[in-house]
């Protein structure tokens, strides 16, 4: 274990986050995550349930919590160390609306107004598709997901797969090898767990 602090500077926020070995991007704010936070869509007006899927040490969850104080932000990760760091970073930043959880701790009937993720592409295509199916099907009617994916790691093929499986997907922006994908809830399927 080697805890260390890193700074996240955004136009509207200046945060210091604690990170450690054994979590994604332990030595820096990942450039894809930074891009998503700078260019990604804002939460819908009146949103009450937001999701950071694969929260890591909490960069996205903490920013969402501070930008959307009336919403509850679910920060979900399979890594216990990441969850501990996310929880501590949310408390330190004053984002008391961030709820850190294991995937199976999220109430089954809960639906999300919006989801943000820098998804774990390197887990493999089948595992990634299963992960996205599980959580995209929990978008509320009209809900949207905002994903950042490196183009060389399959952003375009992922967008095609999402479209093919009924989630309307648009490439909202592209820069420095990253794509920002906006994904809409499947029509007639919103909020139906699989």
Residues of each region from the PLM?
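A short glycine-rich, Lys/Arg-flanked "PGG" loop and its adjoining helix->strand segment in the class I
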Residues: 129-141
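SAM-dependent Rossmann-like transferase core, predominantly class I methyltransferases
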Residues: 1-47
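Class I S-adenosyl-L-methionine
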Residues: 1-2, 154-194
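Short "lid" loop at the C-terminus of a central beta-strand within the Rossmann-like core
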Residues: 121-123, 150-155
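Conserved beta-strand termini and adjacent loop/short-helix elements that scaffold enzyme active sites
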Residues: 20, 101-103, 172-174
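Conserved beta-strand signature within the Rossmann-like core of class I S-adenosyl-L-methionine
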Residues: 142-149
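Conserved SAM/SAH cofactor-binding pocket of Class I
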Residues: 31-117
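Glycine-rich phosphate-binding "P-loop"
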Residues: 114-126
């Amino acid at each position: 274990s080697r805890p260390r602090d890193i700074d996240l500077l955004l136009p509207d926020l200046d945060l210091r986050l604690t990170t450690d070995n054994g979590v994604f991007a332990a030595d820096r704010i990942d450039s894809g995550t930074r891009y998503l936070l700078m260019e990604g869509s804002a939460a819908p007006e009146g949103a009450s349930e937001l999701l950071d899927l694969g929260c890591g040490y909490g960069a996205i969850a903490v920013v969402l919590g501070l930008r959307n104080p009336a919403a509850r932000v679910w920060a979900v990760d399979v890594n216990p160390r990441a969850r501990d760091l996310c929880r501590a970073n949310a408390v330190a930043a004053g984002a008391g609306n961030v709820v850190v959880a294991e995937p199976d701790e999220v109430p089954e009937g809960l639906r999300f107004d919006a989801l943000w993720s820098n998804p774990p592409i390197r887990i493999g295509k089948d595992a990634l598709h299963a992960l996205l199916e599980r959580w995209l099907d929990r978008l509320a009617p009209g809900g949207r997901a905002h994903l950042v994916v490196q183009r060389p790691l399959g952003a375009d093929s992922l967008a095609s797969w999402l479209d093919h499986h009924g989630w309307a997907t648009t490439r909202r922006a592209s820069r420095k090898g990253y794509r920002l994908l906006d994904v809409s809830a499947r029509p007639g399927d919103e909020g139906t767990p699989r």
